[in-house]
Regions:
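Long, terminal "pre-/pro-" and other extracytoplasmic accessory regions
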Residues: 1-234
Length: 234
């Protein structure tokens, strides 16, 4: 059993070294083992010239569950689009494939991005990965894939009972719809539903409205709010 534990920790260190090889010289060490939202992880930290890196590598599958690279970001040199591209490339490298940026905002020199898994044009919001990018250097400074690892699965997608056109008729007439998408969204207690997403404006505010694709009932509505912490959905 002891040899098996050593093999697991060695593999976690190997994965850490490969992922963060471009972050500067450092000597990573396993600082413990923890349950992170039902995912057993090895905690690994390393002090580099650019700052400290802390990461959690899953015991099963060797996936990067989360990490923080404590690097200060100063002057903004990269656009939102460049940050999205760099984050997408990084996720691909980690094995998180078919991911689409569904939300982003900049704050304090850092671009905060949410990526969701997509399949046949359908956005799977439960399968979410959060990524932070330094807008000065393009370095990925943070990641949280907890939701993705807990929820990602092969889904049996049944054909919707209603069309997106029918769902549009259920949207408040005062909402000026700018975009529409098909998505799977969480509805509580581990349940999901297929919905049509409508993004629009009303009285200078942006709203996200979700209409159930099978019942045509409004299941969620969010308003975009600007706060000191950044742009949030509430």
């Amino acid at each position: 059993m002891k040899k098996l534990k050593i093999a697991y920790t060695d593999k976690a260190l190997e994965i850490f070294g490969e992922v963060f090889k471009d972050y500067g010289e450092g000597k990573p060490s396993v600082t413990g083992k923890t349950e992170n939202s039902s995912i057993t992880c090895y905690n690994i930290s390393s002090m580099t010239k650019g700052g400290e890196i802390f990461a959690q590598i899953s015991e099963v599958g060797g996936k990067v569950v989360m990490f923080n690279a404590y690097k200060p970001c100063g002057e903004v040199k990269l656009s939102d689009e460049e940050c999205i591209e760099k984050a997408g490339t990084f996720l691909e490298k980690l094995g998180y494939k078919d991911m689409k940026c569904v939300w982003n905002y900049a704050s304090g020199g850092t671009e905060h991005l949410n990526f969701a898994y997509t399949e046949d044009g359908v956005i799977m919001y439960p399968d979410l990965v959060k990524v932070n990018v330094c807008m000065e250097t393009g370095t990925i400074t943070g990641l949280d894939a907890d939701n993705y690892l807990l929820n990602h699965t092969d889904r049996l997608m049944k054909k919707a009972k209603h069309t997106i056109g029918e769902a549009f008729e259920k949207v408040n007439v005062n909402l000026d719809v700018k975009d529409e998408r098909v998505a799977v969204i969480p509805i509580g207690n581990g349940r999901e539903t297929l919905a049509y997403e409508f993004i629009g404006t009303h009285n200078d505010s942006v709203y996200y409205v979700y209409i159930d694709a099978n019942t045509l009932k409004e299941v969620e509505i969010y308003k975009v709010v600007n706060t000191e912490q950044g742009t949030l959905l509430m």
